[in-house]
Amino acid sequence: MINNVVLIGRLTKDVELRYTPSQVACAQFTLAVNRNFKNQDGQKEADFINCVIWRKSAENLSNWAKKGQLIAITGRIQTRNYENQQGQRVYVTEVVAESFQILEKRDNTANTSSLADSMPDYGPEPDLPF
């Protein structure tokens, strides 16, 4: 069986970082992922996909990614259920992200620098002999 998801989309809001009672980091976020076709009005529509990421990756995503940023994630689809306050069974389907990659720099108005800004600039690569 294969359960593998790869998504590229924009964060609809800042990542919500929480900790379980045993202090395991868990971050929830929603990605807006454009569809590959346009509707009757010529506009591209988007799907809004709920995602969750755990542990150190959750803390890193929360620290580095902000609303509107383009990110890529890999993970799997998972369904869970719980009983709400009214005693009804609620089913939730979401993507459990295993890794992420930020695909663009943060807005220049942010007070903190991005990882890309802290990388040294080595200049162009020399011509290789092969």
UniProtKB/Swiss-Prot annotation:
TM stretches of this protein: none
Record flagged with keyword DNA-binding: yes
Residue ranges of domain SSB in the record: 1-104
Annotated segments matching region Disordered: 108-130
Organism: Streptococcus pyogenes serotype M18 (strain MGAS8232)
Entry keywords, A to Z: DNA-binding
Subunit structure as annotated in this protein's UniProt entry: Homotetramer.
Name of the encoding gene: ssb1
SUPFAM superfamilies: Nucleic acid-binding proteins
Lineage: Bacteria, Bacillati, Bacillota, Bacilli, Lactobacillales
Full protein name: Single-stranded DNA-binding protein 1
Molecular-function GO terms, alphabetical: single-stranded DNA binding
The UniProt record lists the keyword DNA-binding: yes
Database matches in Pfam families: SSB (PF00436)
A GO cellular component annotation in the UniProt record: nucleoid
GO annotation (BP), single: DNA replication
HAMAP family listed in its UniProt record: SSB
Domain of life of the organism encoding this protein: Bacteria
